Amino acid sequence: MKQYLQLCQRIVDEGQWVENKRTGTRCLTVINADLEYDVANNQFPMITTRKSYYKAAIAELLGYLRGYDSAAQFREIGCKTWDANANENSAWLNNPHRKGEDDMGRVYGVQGRAWQRPDGSTLDQLAKVINNLKNGIDDRGEIISFYNPGEFELGCLRPCMHTHTFSLLGDTLYLTSIQRSCDVPLGLNFNQIQCFVLLALVAQITGHKAGKAYHKITNAHIYENQLELMRDVQLKREPFASPQLKINPNIKSLNDIETWVTRDDFEVTGYECHEAIQYPFSV
């Protein structure tokens, strides 16, 4: 929690204004932020200086791991975060590749589970990584990338957190996640929860201990219409201790994740927080 607040304060103190053409809203921006999450000691990185939610973030991650390409699929598992980008993004609405209401196109999990090869076949990056890790293999390329510039026009949004690299040292598994852009007041709570859960979950289904998850953000920003709430409200609050996460121990395979796991198989305990803050979202 402390590192989150330090990043927010850094943006307020040192950030430079950048015009964002996609949203039409200016951002106060810094370059390069490095965060880390102690998964081994179960220090769950959920924001405590405002009321935050974790189940939608986990549901979104499950949708990515399943390769979902429709906002309707995400809604069915308890996540509404793709409704706006699928149905209110003017550039995507006018894109001839859009297949209709709720279509997201070839974004995030589609790339992770069905990366197009030149011969027309697809590569399941996630399955490759899981199979290697289950067999104790780290080829220094246990990487899942959602970032496919050749297909950006086929999706509603370029991936923000785009690359996840797993590293195995002995029986301890580590994760390094790279993010090109982060809406810190709104998006980072989701992102850091997903980094933590991704490592914890993959460690569980591959039979390893979880170590640390490292999270590198290139462009960290606060939108102009969020600044006052961040500076004058959230940063004035004292954080509470980190909560802990419980994962259903019956989740033992990628097939389990694909077939029956829900957001209710994850439970946060010991969460204390301040009152909610309603930050505006820029589409």
Swiss-Prot record:
The Gene Ontology terms for molecular function here are: thymidylate synthase activity
Out of the domains of life, which is the source? Answer: Bacteria
- Catalysed reaction equations from the record: dUMP + (6R)-5,10-methylene-5,6,7,8-tetrahydrofolate = 7,8-dihydrofolate + dTMP
Question: EC number(s) per UniProt?
Answer: 2.1.1.45
Residue runs in coiled coils: none
GO BP: dTMP biosynthetic process; dTTP biosynthetic process; methylation
**Which cellular components does GO assign to this protein?**
cytosol
Q: Gene3D superfamilies, alphabetically?
A: Thymidylate synthase/dCMP hydroxymethylase domain
Q: Which residues form the active site?
A: 160
Residues that hold (6R)-5,10-methylene-5,6,7,8-tetrahydrofolate according to the record:
183, 282
Per UniProt, subunit arrangement is: Homodimer.
Q: Briefly, what is this protein's role?
A: Catalyzes the reductive methylation of 2'-deoxyuridine-5'-monophosphate (dUMP) to 2'-deoxythymidine-5'-monophosphate (dTMP) while utilizing 5,10-methylenetetrahydrofolate (mTHF) as the methyl donor and reductant in the reaction, yielding dihydrofolate (DHF) as a by-product. This enzymatic reaction provides an intracellular de novo source of dTMP, an essential precursor for DNA biosynthesis.
Which named protein is this?
A: Thymidylate synthase
Q: What organism is this sequence from? A: Pseudoalteromonas translucida (strain TAC 125)
- Gene encoding this chain? thyA
